[in-house]
Amino acid sequence: MLYVLVNITMNPTISKSQYVRGLQCEKALWLFRNRKDLLLEPSSATKNILEIGNLIGKLAMDNYPTGIEVTTEYWDINGAIKATKKYIDDGNDIIFEATALHPITGAYSKIDILKRVDNTDLWDLIEVKSSTKVKEYHKDDLAFQYYVFSNSGYKIRNSYMMLIDNSYERIGDIDPTKILRLIDISEQVKNKQNEVNRITLELCNSLTETGEPKEKIGEKCFKPFECDFKSYCWKHVPDYSIY
């Protein structure tokens, strides 16, 4: 039997996307939580990337026709956790957007695909990305998800990235079973757990501050993504700057 923590008294504190944002810059995370009025409108290129991501996500789900999706409102974390547990209790072995919350730090996560290992109480985590190779921030992303799920009662066997297979040749309709491939990054994910715990605590602590953190601008404003608070932080930088 799976003993998943459902009746959580800890309030949700930080999500996976917020964790990844905080890794890039603590100030960006603080602004995201406290000054969303400063966010840049997403560019057409960003919107296109999101659309492609949604398409790849749908293809990934098509690989698992018996899967069931958690469809609670995005802000209803406790509702999503309870729905996930109900689907498991009902005997579902594949759950899309399965949700868990760390009982101590309040970190929470929605995994793209939670898949039971056949005839066991073990589970695999599968994170889907519209990329052809594993990037460092993908490892951080999945390491955070492992951190949340493994500490909330799930026995995790393996952690996978599901990526685009660039050797796939399309003939007719896209075959979802061939255009995507699984890459096992379980060891890298496990090796990051102490780091994830430390950084999560640091980020949660920084979010309690009343003023924005002091951060220097520079290369990190562009890697792994161009920050959507760049116009705010760079407002005093002249056009001829080396940046």
Where are these regions (language model features)?
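Short amphipathic alpha-helical face segments that pack within enzyme cores
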Residues: 140-148
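Non-catalytic protein-protein interaction segments used by genome-maintenance enzymes to assemble
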Residues: 107-140
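Short, flexible loop/turn elements at secondary-structure junctions
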Residues: 98-102, 115-117, 129-132, 163, ...
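Metal-dependent nuclease catalytic regions and adjoining charged, substrate-binding loops involved
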Residues: 133-136, 148-230, 236
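Conserved aromatic-histidine-acidic binding/catalytic patches
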Residues: 48, 52, 101, 105, ...
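Metal-dependent nuclease catalytic cores that hydrolyze phosphodiester bonds in DNA/RNA
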Residues: 1-119, 239-243
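Beta-sheet entry/capping signal
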Residues: 93, 112, 122-124, 157-160
